[in-house]
Amino acid sequence: MRVGIPTETKNNEFRVAITPAGVAELTRRGHEVLIQAGAGEGSAITDADFKAAGAQLVGTADQVWADADLLLKVKEPIAAEYGRLRHGQILFTFLHLAASRACTDALLDSGTTSIAYETVQTADGALPLLAPMSEVAGRLAAQVGAYHLMRTQGGRGVLMGGVPGVEPADVVVIGAGTAGYNAARIANGMGATVTVLDINIDKLRQLDAEFCGRIHTRYSSAYELEGAVKRADLVIGAVLVPGAKAPKLVSNSLVAHMKPGAVLVDIAIDQGGCFEGSRPTTYDHPTFAVHDTLFYCVANMPASVPKTSTYALTNATMPYVLELADHGWRAACRSNPALAKGLSTHEGALLSERVATDLGVPFTEPASVLA
């Protein structure tokens, strides 16, 4: 099979969908690997590195898209790439379709077979391809939140850990999943007072046990959420419903009652965001004001640390890439139910029930295309 990797096109997206180790394994198995020249530069992987591993360097993205049977990306296609989507090609990448009707329509119109990293799900409910980027985004959320709390950045002028005799920042994390856990862990390590809210008592119990009560936990009722947000210097939204739009848990009217200069970091922005006022931003212009607070809603946070993120992501994706390349998408999905959970579109059919519900598009059972 011909496996293609173009350069990422999203704003300040420095990750790449494969490493030289992945290239070497694919070519060892007899597959061709086509990589757009310069695709790895943002992750400090040179063309020479890829070529030495067995890749063929291609001059343009158009050629990669046109020649590849299996196309690997990190982020969803942007509008400039919609014309490259085509029938008969497998696209394996993050998609986040519930938050993008335009991308969904482009995939359906093209007939592309697409598989979303973020909805590949094992029998125990784990999301093995989303997890490493959630770890990175959660850890970054505490860092960027601390940075934007500085008065010079428009924040309250609060130091996360305080100093002797002066109280630390009050950090609230909404969601105790992978991203929320990692955000809370870093914020706690920085010395902040951290409260995590979730509706999953087992996750709260795990946090309480691991951190011996140093991280406060609350069941996420409307009452507890409102009180915590009003007290917070920094709120980190880390809510996830796999494949679906994130619920809007923090209203603009609640934001209006927050402390002036408080910062809100929305990790859930890829899925539409969990704050009412959220809208996607970029690293060029990462923040905007809502009432007297500062919103940070960069949709590709892990892109800022590509030397970490590229390797963390590809460590997780490569076993699935090898299955797709070795057996084709249909056989791979038949033999691996976790991969089948990631099926999103095929020949104009939408195969994700949650995306179909959120966007009001007819749903097709994946089993019907796997038969």
UniProtKB/Swiss-Prot annotation:
Its cofactor is Mg(2+). Relatively stable, it loses only 25% of its total activity after 4 hours at 60 degrees Celsius. The enzyme is much more active at temperatures above 37 degrees Celsius, particularly in the reductive amination. The velocity almost doubles at temperatures between 60-65 degrees Celsius compared with 37 degrees Celsius. Above 65 degrees Celsius there is a sharp decrease in activity, due to thermal inactivation of the enzyme. Optimum pH is between 10 and 11 for the oxidative deamination and between 7 and 7.5 for the reductive amination. GO terms for molecular function: alanine dehydrogenase activity; metal ion binding; nucleotide binding. It comes from the Bacteria. InterPro entries: Ala_DH, Ala_DH/PNT_CS2, AlaDH/PNT_CS1, AlaDH/PNT_N, AlaDH/PNT_NAD(H)-bd, NAD(P)-bd_dom_sf. One of its GO terms (biological process) is L-alanine catabolic process. NAD(+) binds at residues 134, 178-179, 198, 203, 220, 239-240, 267-270, 279, 298-301. Binds 1 Mg(2+) ion per subunit. Inhibited by CuSO(4) and ZnCl(2). Its EC number is 1.4.1.1. Pathway: Amino-acid degradation; L-alanine degradation via dehydrogenase pathway; NH(3) and pyruvate from L-alanine: step 1/1. The active site is at H96, D270. It is an enzyme of class 1 (oxidoreductase). It is found in: Secreted. Mg(2+) binds at E323, H327. One of its GO terms (cellular component) is cytosol. Its main location: secreted. It catalyses: L-alanine + NAD(+) + H2O = pyruvate + NH4(+) + NADH + H(+). Catalyzes the reversible reductive amination of pyruvate to L-alanine. However, since the physiological environment of M.tuberculosis has a neutral pH, it can be assumed that the enzyme catalyzes exclusively the formation of L-alanine. May play a role in cell wall synthesis as L-alanine is an important constituent of the peptidoglycan layer. Belongs to the AlaDH/PNT family. This is Alanine dehydrogenase.
